[in-house]
């Protein structure tokens, strides 16, 4: 009986290997040869799943953005008050653990590549747009519940996104989460300013 191969799982495994190599050695370390060796493939066998490094990088970029979206959705408790949901969204967008920090570090390593790839630029801008809309929506819901004051929520969402991106950059130098308490304090201060 022929062996059944889950090709989608193999692609996911290859992306995980690429992420691991990028974390250890940066973008340049993730060559087709290094990815194949780490994944246990012959160099040419990767081409069955990805035609080249560009397609692996694109899949890795998409995977990291999907991870961030998933963590954000999972941070929200059903039935929470609008203010608590806002707090959860804020907490879900700032790095809160080693896995989120590692994922952010991979994303940053891929930014330079994404700048010259129109499809990835659009993908990231779309991600930022969803994130911004979610923050504004959560602030408006908290306002409607009487928990926070009416303010320029679009500007506040932009500020928060900038801080979250900055936290991701800072984590390049603090990969073990030494700054997580600072981010939690910032969320408390941000919420206090909204009240």
Predicted regions and their residues:
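Solvent-exposed, amphipathic alpha-helical segments
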Residues: 13, 17-25, 71-75, 106, ...
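Helix-turn-helix
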Residues: 13, 17-59
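Hydrophobic alpha-helical connector segments
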Residues: 59-62, 70-103, 154-160, 184
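Short coil/turn segments at alpha/beta junctions that flank glycine-rich nucleotide-binding fingerprints
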Residues: 24-28, 79, 100, 145
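Hydrophobic/aromatic-rich alpha-helical bundle segments in the mid-to-C-terminal region
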Residues: 101, 119-125, 129, 143-190, ...
């Amino acid at each position: 009986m022929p062996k059944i191969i889950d090709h989608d799982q193999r692609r996911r495994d290859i992306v995980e290997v690429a992420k691991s190599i990028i974390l250890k050695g940066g973008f340049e370390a993730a060559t087709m040869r290094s990815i194949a060796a780490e994944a246990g493939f012959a160099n040419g066998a990767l081409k069955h799943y990805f035609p080249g490094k560009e397609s692996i990088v694109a899949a890795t970029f998409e995977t990291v953005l999907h991870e961030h979206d998933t963590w954000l959705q999972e941070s929200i408790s059903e039935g929470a008050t609008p203010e608590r949901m806002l707090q959860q969204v804020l907490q879900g967008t700032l790095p809160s653990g080693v896995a989120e920090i590692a994922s952010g570090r991979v994303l940053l390593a891929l930014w330079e590549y994404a700048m010259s790839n129109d499809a990835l630029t659009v993908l990231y801008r779309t991600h930022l747009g969803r994130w911004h809309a979610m923050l504004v929506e959560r602030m408006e819901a908290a306002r409607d519940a009487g928990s926070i004051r009416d303010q320029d929520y679009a500007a506040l969402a932009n500020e928060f996104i900038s801080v979250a991106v900055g936290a991701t950059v800072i984590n390049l130098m603090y990969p073990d989460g030494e700054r997580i308490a600072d981010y939690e304090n910032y969320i408390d201060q941000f919420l206090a300013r909204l009240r």
